[in-house]
């Protein structure tokens, strides 16, 4: 009888260790990074404006800045300006930008969570980026001003529904 109790205890002990080990493995899979940028400068306030010459320079600068970051997936909304912002880096990396809906930030966040072990770039808009970052679990970031195009958010997954974000500036374009 004591042997059975010892055996059960031993099995429970082993099961506990395996469960703890799987938890550590699951947690360590959340090692991905998401770079998030607003589209570059545009020519006008029209709904689907194209990039200005300065915006095209910034898009090239983005490709140079993140070209060696190990990006595996690129998301951009369907607007011309976001696609144009993503184009130089997609070309440099040999990737295609996956088009996402402008306002459906929840769907994008769901996709990003399934890629929590990857390095991803998101090209979006001033009014959606803060919401995406908050929904990813990094808290709030300052609103993006209408004339602000140089913010580069670097989000790092720390768990399935959490992460940390650092805000950088890139490309001091004239």
Put a short name on every predicted segment.
Residues 123-125:
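Short beta-strand segments
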């Amino acid at each position: 009888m004591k042997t059975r109790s010892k055996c059960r205890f031993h099995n429970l002990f082993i099961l506990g260790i395996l469960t703890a080990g799987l938890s550590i493995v699951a947690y360590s899979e959340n090692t991905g990074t998401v770079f998030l940028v607003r589209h570059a400068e545009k020519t006008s306030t029209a709904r689907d404006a194209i990039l200005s010459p300065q915006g095209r320079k910034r898009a090239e600068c983005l490709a140079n800045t993140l070209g060696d970051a190990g990006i595996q997936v690129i998301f951009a909304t369907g607007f011309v300006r976001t696609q144009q912002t993503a184009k130089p880096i997609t070309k440099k990396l040999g990737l295609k930008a996956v088009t996402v809906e402008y306002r459906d930030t929840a769907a994008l966040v769901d996709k990003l969570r399934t890629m929590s072990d990857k390095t991803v770039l998101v090209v979006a808009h001033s009014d959606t980026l803060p919401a995406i970052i908050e929904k990813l679990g990094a808290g709030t970031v300052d609103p993006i001003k209408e004339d602000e195009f140089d913010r580069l958010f670097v989000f790092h997954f720390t768990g399935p529904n959490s992460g940390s974000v650092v805000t950088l500036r890139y490309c001091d374009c004239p």
